[in-house]
Amino acid sequence: MLSVLFCSRVKGNPASNLPKLLDSAVKHTLPDERDKIEFLIKYDDDDDQRPPDSFFARYPFTIRRFVWSRGEGRHGLHHAQEYLFTQRDPRARFLLMTADDFYFTRTGFVSEILSVPDEFCIMGHNRPPIEAFAGIYEQESAIRQWNVAFGEMSPVVSVRLIEVCQNFGWQSNVDSWLMALSVVLYDMYKIVLWRALTPYYLREGGYGLGDTPTYNNMELTARKNPGNKYWFELLRRQARNVYLNIVHGTDLRPESFWSPHRLWWKLRSQPIHQLPLRAYRAALRGLPKAG
């Protein structure tokens, strides 16, 4: 299943066009895909122009709305996304992170996304030059390049990646965070999670620059780099968590006592000088007793 997550504000927002987004979803989803896509939308409680229930009832797929305070507006997008993530249908394998000024343009995108077997995956319209920023991604000039290398993106990200990373990057631009995480993953482990999809959406609004004052000194926008460089250390920790889950698996059930991985771990944990003696004792235990 595909969960589409976004925040919408009608009041004072001329770029908002939710009817066009949802109408395009009807046009470009097949009848047997409509139970495989859901929309989770957050509204501000002071937005008295948000659509009524009757507007949403006419659509042939699940649409769930949530309403709470505006807070810091756009700067709080990641907090809203984290909550919407926890409310998604538990069958969902992928998230589409979008906005209410996008609309769909190609039929079949739902089935195409859901056909991807990868447990850890990021999908966008293009494949940015991730490898080009290895070793230099913290430099100010490099940040200005990789931060816009993906274009106007409404990213698809696997649910498992968010479960392992535990958030959407400590700031409101999920596409910038996913690009940064991708660069760090390649820099540390030579792993690339990014896939390119044939374009299936367009945007009528524009970049949300997010340059109004905010408490968050880790905000990353088209014009501003993170003021708190600890953000990059947090990214490296996320990258390591992803790597360890890829290598060791994401199954939370305890391993069998006799599993190869557990036995190898126990073997490696022993001081090397004890191994010959332990092997000798094990061999003795296996010999038949005299008499």
How does the language model describe each region?
Residues 12-30:
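Short, well-formed alpha-helical segments that are part of the catalytic scaffolds
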Residues 9-14, 46-48, 101-104, 129-130, ...:
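Short acidic, S/G/P-rich loop/turn micro-motifs used as interaction or catalytic elements
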Residues 45-91:
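Active-site-proximal specificity loops/subdomain of glycosyltransferases
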Residues 6-8, 41-45, 98, 124:
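Short beta-strand/turn micro-motifs composed of small residues
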Residues 92-103:
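Short beta-strand-to-loop acidic/aromatic patch adjacent to the donor-nucleotide binding site
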Residues 103-179:
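Conserved catalytic core of nucleotide-sugar-dependent glycosyltransferases
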